Amino acid sequence: MKSIQIAIDGPASSGKSTVAKIIAKNLGYTYLDTGAMYRSATYLALTNGIEVTDQNRIVDLLAQYPIRFGRDENGQQLVFVGDEDVTLPIRDNQVTNNVSAVAALPLVREELVRLQQDIAQAGGIVMDGRDIGTVVLPQAELKIFLVASVEERALRRFKENTERGIETDLESLKEEIAARDYKDSNREVSPLKAADDAITFDTTGVSIEGVVKFISEKAKEILDR
């Protein structure tokens, strides 16, 4: 049976992960949350008292505490570093505010991109991140670049944090997201940008179902060829 690689990129809180999970489940594909991998690397640095710019020591930690994924009894994604479940801790504000610095480190990116590409060899996959269509899966048959206003993305993150019991301030989130956009778009290594052959879709005011429908239709067009 024909299967394809689907790359979904976009800035923070543009809806990538939520949509990617649903599409992967609907197609019976593997879903890989690359953002969780960079968050895990950031978490390792912070909890081990290592500077978030010390790429050699962070890469050593990644070898010592490998990142892996699992599922709970409800099918929800779990993230581990070594044997530690870090599913919730990696969403902490301290991790969020430092992950761009870690994601900009060439050696860390090289290590995690290699791992991501290895996982993608298994067959049909939906991967989301910042550089999937440009660096990780440049040959992906379907590349989507999701965008949304800062205001809408801050509101989404606010709701997510509230549901997780993380105390947050909406105005602060707007500032943090705008700052992260700048860092992600202007870093030297693998900056956030749409691939030349990506389809850009503005999710502002669009429901999750609407975004899933749009991407699913594009995938079906390719699979039906």
Curated annotation (Swiss-Prot):
Keywords, alphabetical = ATP-binding, Cytoplasm, Kinase, Nucleotide-binding, Transferase
Q: Which InterPro entries match?
A: Cytidylate_kin (IPR003136), Cytidylate_kinase_dom (IPR011994), P-loop_NTPase (IPR027417)
What enzyme class is recorded for this protein?
Answer: transferase
Q: What is its EC number?
A: 2.7.4.25
**One Gene Ontology CC term in the entry:** cytosol
Q: Does the keyword Nucleotide-binding apply?
A: yes
Return one GO MF term. Answer: ATP binding
Q: Which domain of life is it from?
A: Bacteria
Q: Which Pfam families match?
A: Cytidylate_kin (PF02224)
Q: Provide the leader sequence positions.
A: none
Q: Does the keyword Ligase apply?
A: no
- Which biological processes are named by the entry's GO terms? nucleobase-containing small molecule interconversion; pyrimidine nucleotide metabolic process
- List positions binding ATP: G10, P11, A12, S13, S14, G15, K16, S17, T18
User: Which reaction equations make up its catalytic activity?
Assistant: CMP + ATP = CDP + ADP; dCMP + ATP = dCDP + ADP
Instruction: Provide the protein's localization.
Output: Cytoplasm
Of which family is this protein a member?
Answer: Belongs to the cytidylate kinase family. Type 1 subfamily.
* Family matches, as PANTHER family: CYTIDYLATE KINASE (PTHR21299:SF2), CYTIDYLATE KINASE/PANTOATE-BETA-ALANINE LIGASE (PTHR21299)
Question: By its UniProt entry, which HAMAP family does this protein fall under?
Answer: Cytidyl_kinase_type1
Q: What is this protein called?
A: Cytidylate kinase
> What is the originating organism of this protein?
Streptococcus suis (strain 05ZYH33)
- List the taxonomic lineage: Bacteria, Bacillati, Bacillota, Bacilli, Lactobacillales
GN (gene name): cmk
